[in-house]
Amino acid sequence: MPDDNENLAQSQSRLFRFVTLLSRHKVDFLVIGGQAEILMGGARVTFDTDLCYDRSPHNLERLASALAEINPSLRGAPAELPFKFDAQALAFGSNYTLVTDIGALDLLGWVEPIGDYNALQASAETHVVRQTPVRTIGLEDLIRIKEHINRPKDRDSLFQLIAIRAIRNEQRKKNTDDHV
């Protein structure tokens, strides 16, 4: 059975592959959920990748083109269910749970209680995975979402996210004090 370090390495490998693919296609997206929590310093194990994507027509075309390379299918749907995952399908829906050649992918066009990509990207952060910049949801937005969803695993995440916020605030205070 893999240990937490192996799970983290596999999780970051999947994330890196998704980020590389989408970046190559110039898709506008943010990493949200458990992967964002990990990039912020949280000790979380997650087996899927959650992304919020811009729903502009050009971005939907780029996203559909990128996803075509990794054979997306609807997670939990019967294999024989006909589904063509293209820009038009993306435009008709908003949130998708997918299985791909890389792994599980949740694509969210709308994230409660905040809104769409544009609302989230206003406070987005940049983290680095394997020397590659990765844009994530902002810490305060992630806390707000976890509070809103309020599942047991989200409540567990809240403890870590609030601790990360406290550490960041303390570091900011220390940096301010050092410059006074």
What kind of region is each of these model predictions?
Residues 1-180:
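Compositionally biased terminal segments of proteins
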